[in-house]
Amino acid sequence: MSNLMKNFFTELVKSTTFTTKVSVVKTTLSNWLCEQVYPDKDFSLKLKRVVNMFLNNEIENNKIYKLVETVDSSNKLSRRQVDFLIHALLNNVSVTFTLHRFVDDNVLTQDELSFLANFLVTKMDEAYQLPAY
């Protein structure tokens, strides 16, 4: 098989994998919001407060590390990778705009969920490629 064909199939597999990841993240996020966040007004309010605090840099990184350690029981993310993700989230105007819409009591659209899923998968892939030191 020629190098051109090998490269084509390699890129096809990467794209399919990426597309699948985005689809899974979007579906999971949508289900979580619709089934657990939006219906539960108390939880929704608390989550929106935390997201707002995050957007306003009111949460210390050490607290974010502890939260990630709790959620990421296999410890796949180093603090450096978490810092990368924090920076990526807070420095993307479209992400912060979308999160502010959520905080302001708006139901996120399917387009917004697609955008967030694409962004999260891209940045997680980039974070996993960083050296863990």
Curated annotation (Swiss-Prot):
Protein name: Protein Ac75
Keywords from the UniProt entry: Host cytoplasm, Host nucleus, Virion
Major localization class: virion
Listed GO biological process terms: exit of virus from host cell nucleus by nuclear egress
Entry GO CC: host cell cytoplasm; host cell nucleus; virion component
Keyword Cell cycle assigned: no
Binding partners and assembly: Interacts with protein Ac76.
Any Pfam family hit: AcMNPV_Ac75
Gene: Ac75
Lineage of the organism: Viruses, Viruses incertae sedis, Naldaviricetes, Lefavirales, Baculoviridae
Function: Plays a role in nuclear egress of nucleocapsids and intranuclear microvesicle formation.
Cellular location(s): Virion; Host cytoplasm; Host nucleus
Domain of life where this protein originates: Viruses
